[in-house]
């Protein structure tokens, strides 16, 4: 990911805990690049928020569809705790339904990353609905 981002002059990259370390990604891409880092649980979040210069944290998963994953999701209360613990912009990821977006953004979460709920049913309508919700939070 980071090598590809560099080779195509992308604005940045996102790295997970199993990817290239953040500090190495920053050296490769430079200070002006946008670099986000994933946090899949509370301990990872604590580590990531201490990294100097992280542009955003991808907090996942918001919710879960399986019992196996239930113990690892953040939910609204977990996202609220994360938002209160850092000034780094947060992006909620994983298991987000359109009906969740407003509640998530009310917590001062900076954005949502969604796939499945957008692709169910009328894709265009779903995207427009989410866009409308997000637009209501943008600063004028």
What name fits each language-model region?
Residues 1-4, 19, 42, 63, ...:
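Conserved beta-strand edge residues that scaffold enzyme active sites
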Residues 3-6, 23-26, 46, 80, ...:
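Alpha-helical segments flanking ligand/cofactor-binding loops in enzyme cores
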Residues 6-15, 35-84, 123-126:
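Glycine/Thr-rich beta-alpha phosphate-binding loop at enzyme active sites
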Residues 15-24, 58-70, 101-133:
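Glycine-rich phosphate-binding active-site loops on the catalytic face of alpha/beta enzymes
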Residues 17-19, 24-41, 71-98, 130-140:
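Alpha-helix-loop-beta-strand connector modules within alpha/beta enzyme cores
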Residues 27, 49-53, 105-108:
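Acidic (Asp/Glu)-rich catalytic clusters
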């Amino acid at each position: 990911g980071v090598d590809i981002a560099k080779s195509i002059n992308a604005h940045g990259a996102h790295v997970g805990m199993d990817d290239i370390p953040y500090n190495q990604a920053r050296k490769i891409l430079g200070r002006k690049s946008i670099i986000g880092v994933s946090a899949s649980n509370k301990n990872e979040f604590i580590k990531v928020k201490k990294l100097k210069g992280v542009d955003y944290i991808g907090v996942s998963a918001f919710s879960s569809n399986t019992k196996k994953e239930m113990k690892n999701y953040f939910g609204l209360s977990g996202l609220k705790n994360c938002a209160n613990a850092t000034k780094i912009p947060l992006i909620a990821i994983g298991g987000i339904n359109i009906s969740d977006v407003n509640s998530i953004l009310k917590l001062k979460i900076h954005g949502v990353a969604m796939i499945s709920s957008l692709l169910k049913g009328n894709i265009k309508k779903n995207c427009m609905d989410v866009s409308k919700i997000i637009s209501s939070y943008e600063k004028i």
